[in-house]
Amino acid sequence: MTTMATAAPVRASQAWYKILYVQVLIAILIGAMVGCLWPSVATNDWVKALGDGFIKLIKMVIAPIIFCTVTSGIAHIQDAKKVGCVGVKALFYFEIVSSFALLLGLAMGNLVRIGHGLAVKPDAAAVANYVKQAEASKTVDFILNIIPDSVVGAFARGDVLQVLLFAILFGFSLMALGKRGERLRGMIDDVAHAVFGVIAIVMKAAPIGAFGAMAFTVGKFGPAALGNLIGLIALFYVTAALFVVVVLGLIARLVGFSIFKFLIYIKDELLIVLGTSSSESALPQLMEKLERLGCSKPVVGLVVPTGYSFNLDGTNIYMTLATLFIAQALGVDLSFGQQLTILLVAMLTSKGASGVTGAGFITLAATLSVVNPALVPGMAIVFSIDKFMSEVRALTNIIGNGIAAVFVSWWESELDHVTLQTRLNKSTASTTIDTTST
């Protein structure tokens, strides 16, 4: 199975002020300061436009990203024929674990209610059209609207579910073509690389967008808004840690190894992901390490790349948690039925998320636009802190895909338990020695 990920190039260390993470951090601090000291300046339409403009740039690439990632992911599943029912087992595992991630994010969001009391009131004119569309929508219309009148129209409007439906059908069609579809699959992968290049260009404007979003948020809603945003970051970190330790930890224990030893074993890959905010940056290295860990090569070759479209646990947690935060901040009370809709929609939109930097925010935009378009303007609230959550999203994603490969190998009775324990114990011992020597 092929993948759109490539090994991260080795780069010489660059000046600290050229690192995107540092630039965004500085922009956020300056934005918060401007919002506190000069609220009249911070609430200027031009300052607000900086954040809104960046969000529009992100929304611009939603449709092509979903089409390319979903189509490519499904089309390449033809390799599952070589490994029996591995593909079916992997997809079953992905859906079950993804559901746990979504439910955990939803549960923590309802339990802590970190956005409650923020009382953000977005521009009424900007929201009016969304509200009108939401009120006019009926269930049967919602279902029928998933089917596009034309594919071109779906892409032109950026209708997420319509593009997703076409991507799924197109992916299965390519899979059925077999070798005849190889050239077209390659073209789609090339287009995906080009779209990721667009994202890379757009992300260079992230500091400007972060400044505008933070300055406007603090200037309009006061310094108290900072407390809620920091609270959201902390809540997401805690929720992701709970998922890794409890959910993935139980899966690891079922197979017969410690989740903590596994984390030590892939520590180098985790550091790469931490530095790039993209779980795809360490994909080739992760696959190699999983094979050396005793996992079946065909299973690793299928499960890990497929997981980058179908098993993004960190992104799933983020989507439900951020959606609830935005709804609470805007004073929108979501019923049980609406929260159930969030789960169902997120199960679909998350399949269009890639491990590329910023994809989690793109997926959030896709989810909000389907669940309740009136919440879309609220994305500006969380955009300014998205960079601080992207690292944890990426880390959780890569850990989840690593555990998935080990579990499916075990499920298929193609896991070398002796090699598994030997490698994990050796890695833990070497880390302990290194720590002691320093």
UniProtKB/Swiss-Prot annotation:
Stretches that traverse the bilayer: 20-42, 57-77, 90-112, 160-179, 192-214, 229-251, 324-346, 361-383
Biological function: Responsible for the transport of dicarboxylates such as succinate, fumarate, and malate from the periplasm across the membrane.
Subcellular location: Cell inner membrane
A GO CC annotation given for this chain: plasma membrane
Disulfide partners: none
Name used for this protein in its record: C4-dicarboxylate transport protein 1
Organism the protein comes from: Bradyrhizobium diazoefficiens (strain JCM 10833 / BCRC 13528 / IAM 13628 / NBRC 14792 / USDA 110)
Biological-process GO terms, alphabetical: L-aspartate transmembrane transport
Keyword Cytoplasm (UniProt): no
Topology within the bilayer: Multi-pass membrane protein
InterPro entries in alphabetical order: C4_dicarb_transport, Na-dicarboxylate_symporter, Na-dicarboxylate_symporter_CS, Na:dicarbo_symporter_sf
Pfam families for this protein: SDF
Listed PANTHER family: AEROBIC C4-DICARBOXYLATE TRANSPORT PROTEIN, PROTON/GLUTAMATE-ASPARTATE SYMPORTER
Gene name per UniProt: dctA1
The keyword Cell membrane is assigned to this record: yes
